[in-house]
C-alpha cells in the first residue's frame, strides 16, 4: 500500500478551484483545438501541466519579496542571489535571466554556429528548439535502459558514454561547441543522472576539448536521488553532493522556476572569462542590465532564498515521496507508467495505455485530452507532438521512442486527496481506454508546435 509523506510545512494561504461539468469540458476542449495549452487555468480542476513556476512559495520567500531593491543597477538582491549561486555551484560568473529558455538562448547564441551538434542525454523542448534556432543539431544519446518504460534502474537518466565517444569521433570535436546533461532527465521521465555518469561525461568531453554544461533545472532533486541510491553518498550533505555535480561542469543553465521554487526566474552560470563577456553583452541586448536580467529585485530575492530552500532535505524527502505516492497508487491500479518514478512528475506510458492508437494518430495527445474530459485534469504530452520530426533526406516522419503523458506535480501545492482524485480518474479512464480515439493536426508550427498546435479527432 502506497504511503503518503507528511508535509514538512503548514498551509497559510489557499486558492479556490472549481470543477467544470463534463458538457462544459467537452465544449472547452473543442474550442481549444484539443490543445490543453489553450485552455484557461480557471477551467482546469487539477493542473499538472508543469511544475515550472507553479510552486507555492514560502513565508520566507514572500518576506524577501517585500525587501525588493528596484534600483536599475547594483540592487542588493542581485548580490544575495550571487552569494547563493556561487556557494552552490562554484561557478565564477553568472547572469540572471527571466527564465531558463532565455539562458539557453544566450548560451547557444554565443556558442553554436550553423552545422554544429550539441549532444546530451536528452534535450528538453526549449533546449532543442534553441539549438535548432541557431542552425545546430541537438542529439540525444540516452542509455538504452532509459528508453524502456518498465525497466527499473536507479539512474535511467544517464547518457550512454560509448555512444557519446562514438558520436564525437564521427562528428569531430571542432563541430561540437559544447555537450550537455539534463539533470534530472525531463524528457526521459524525470530520471536522475548518477554522479559517476556526470564525472565520466565531463572526462569524455574535456578529453576532446569540448566544454560541458548542465541543464540544472532540477539539480536538487537529482542530488537527493544520488543520496538515496548511491551508497557512497548516503551520509553526504545535499549541498556537498550538489557542489560535486557542478564541479565537473564548465557552466549551467537553470530555470529557477523548478528547484528554486519561484514563479519566474533563471540564470546562466559559467567559468570561462571570455565567454562570460559575450554572454553579458548578449544579456544586455535581450534581457536587461546584468544585475537584474529581466527580473524585478523582489524576484531576485525570492530566487536567492528558494535556491537554499530547494536543497532542504526534509523538503526533498517530502517532494520525492509525494511523486512516488502517485506512481505507486497508479501501479496498484495496473495503470502503465514509466518506472521507477522520477522526481517531479509521473509519466503515463501512452503506447501501453492506448495500444490501438498508432504514433501517427498521436496517442499521447489523445490521452491528455481524455484526462481533461474525464476529470478536468491538465497534463502534457511528451511524445510525437513534442518531438516527432521529418527526416530532411527521406521526408519520412521520425517518431520518438517514448510516447508519454507527463503529470507534473507543482511543489507544495496539492494534497493527498488531490493525488487520489488523479488516480481515480486515471483508473476510470483505463477501464474504457478502447473508447479513446486518435487525433490529427489542423495546425502545426515548425518549432515548439505543442504550445500552439491545434487538433481534431480522427
What is each stretch, according to the model?
Residues 2-34, 38-41, 46-56, 61, ...:
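Conserved PLP-enzyme active-site core in the AAT-like
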Residues 68, 253, 406-410:
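Short glycine-rich or small-residue beta-strand-to-loop segments that form or flank ligand, phosphate
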Residues 21, 58, 366-371, 427:
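C-terminal, active-site-flanking charged/polar segments
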Residues 264, 344, 403-407:
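Short amphipathic alpha-helical segments
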Amino acid at each position: 500500500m502506497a504511503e503518503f509523506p507528511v508535509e514538512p510545512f503548514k498551509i497559510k494561504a489557499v486558492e479556490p478551484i472549481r470543477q467544470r461539468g463534463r458538457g462544459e469540458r467537452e465544449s472547452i476542449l473543442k474550442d481549444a483545438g484539443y490543445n490543453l495549452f489553450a485552455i484557461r487555468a480557471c477551467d482546469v480542476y487539477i493542473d499538472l501541466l508543469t511544475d515550472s513556476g507553479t510552486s507555492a512559495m514560502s513565508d520566507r520567500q514572500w518576506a524577501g519579496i517585500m525587501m525588493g531593491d528596484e534600483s536599475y543597477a547594483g540592487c542588493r538582491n542581485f548580490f544575495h542571489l550571487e552569494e547563493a549561486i556561487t556557494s552552490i555551484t562554484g561557478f565564477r560568473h553568472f547572469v540572471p535571466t527571466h527564465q531558463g529558455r532565455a539562458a539557453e538562448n544566450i548560451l547557444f547564441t554565443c556558442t553554436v554556429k550553423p552545422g554544429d551538434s550539441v549532444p546530451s542525454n536528452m534535450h528538453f523542448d526549449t533546449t532543442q528548439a534553441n539549438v535548432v534556432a541557431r542552425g545546430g543539431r541537438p542529439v540525444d544519446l540516452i542509455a538504452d535502459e532509459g528508453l524502456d518504460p518498465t525497466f527499473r534502474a536507479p539512474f535511467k537518466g544517464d547518457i550512454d558514454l560509448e555512444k557519446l565517444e562514438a558520436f564525437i569521433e564521427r562528428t569531430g570535436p571542432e563541430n561540437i561547441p559544447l555537450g550537455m546533461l539534463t539533470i534530472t532527465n525531463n524528457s526521459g521521465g524525470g530520471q536522475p543522472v548518477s554522479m559517476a555518469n556526470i564525472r565520466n561525461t565531463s572526462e569524455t568531453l574535456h578529453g576532446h576539448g569540448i566544454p560541458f554544461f548542465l541543464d540544472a533545472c532540477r539539480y536538487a532533486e537529482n542530488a537527493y536521488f544520488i543520496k538515496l541510491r548511491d551508497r557512497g553518498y548516503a551520509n553526504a550533505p545535499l549541498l556537498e553532493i550538489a557542489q560535486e555535480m557542478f564541479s565537473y561542469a564548465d557552466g549551467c543553465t537553470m530555470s529557477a522556476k523548478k528547484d528554486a521554487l519561484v514563479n519566474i526566474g533563471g540564470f546562466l552560470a559559467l567559468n570561462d572569462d571570455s565567454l562570460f563577456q559575450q554572454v553579458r553583452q548578449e544579456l544586455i541586448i535581450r534581457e536587461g542590465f546584468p544585475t537584474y536580467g529581466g527580473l524585478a529585485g523582489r524576484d531576485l530575492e525570492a530566487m536567492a532564498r528558494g535556491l537554499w530552500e530547494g536543497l532542504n532535505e526534509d523538503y526533498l524527502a517530502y517532494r520525492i515521496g509525494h511523486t512516488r505516492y502517485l506512481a505507486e497508487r497508479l501501479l496498484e491500479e495496473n495503470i502503465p507508467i514509466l518506472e521507477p518514478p522520477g522526481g517531479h512528475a509521473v509519466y503515463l506510458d501512452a503506447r501501453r495505455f492506448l495500444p490501438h492508437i498508432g504514433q501517427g494518430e498521436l496517442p499521447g495527445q489523445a490521452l491528455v485530452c481524455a484526462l481533461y474530459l474525464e476529470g478536468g485534469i491538465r497534463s502534457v504530452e511528451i511524445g510525437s507532438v513534442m518531438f516527432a520530426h521529418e527526416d530532411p533526406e527521406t521526408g519520412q516522419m521520425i517518431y520518438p521512442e517514448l510516447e508519454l503523458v507527463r503529470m507534473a506535480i507543482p511543489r507544495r501545492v496539492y494534497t493527498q486527496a488531490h493525488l487520489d482524485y488523479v488516480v481515480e480518474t486515471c483508473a476510470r479512464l483505463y477501464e474504457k481506454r478502447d473508447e479513446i480515439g486518435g487525433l490529427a493536426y489542423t495546425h502545426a508550427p515548425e518549432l515548439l508546435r505543442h504550445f500552439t498546435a491545434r487538433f481534431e479527432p480522427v
